[in-house]
Amino acid sequence: MLFYCEFTWFPGTSRADVARRVVQQHDAGANNPERIHGWYNLVGGGAGFLLVDYDDPAELTAFLQPYMDLMSFDVRAVTQNTYGETIEGLREVAAQTT
């Protein structure tokens, strides 16, 4: 399942703090890069989001926990919509409710 993991650094967290932790987790083999489908930082720094693929929410939690002293997370399961199919489905819903 695909998860959207929005993160915001806690006040006082520095770029160096985050860099050290990310590299530490990478070197330990704990970042699971094959599960990361996207990693985006917001302009201005200190926030962003990951798109990650996990079947087990407990595994996702274990992936995020080493960072939880540096940043907060808002995690949501997401699904992908195909535009054309979604429009057709919405047409059907709209027709039923009028």
Report the location of each language-model feature.
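Short S/T/G/P-rich N-terminal loop/turn motif that feeds into the first structured element of a domain
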Residues: 1-31, 35-46, 55, 80-81, ...
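Hydrophobic pocket/interface hotspot
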Residues: 5, 50, 60
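Short amphipathic alpha-helices in soluble, non-transmembrane regions
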Residues: 21-23, 60-69
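Short connector loops at helix/strand junctions that flank enzyme active sites
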Residues: 44-47, 68-70
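Conserved catalytic core of Hanks-type protein kinase domains
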Residues: 53-54, 66
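Generic hydrophobic/packing signal
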Residues: 54, 59-60, 73
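Conserved short beta-strand edge segments in small beta-sheet-based binding/regulatory domains
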Residues: 70-81
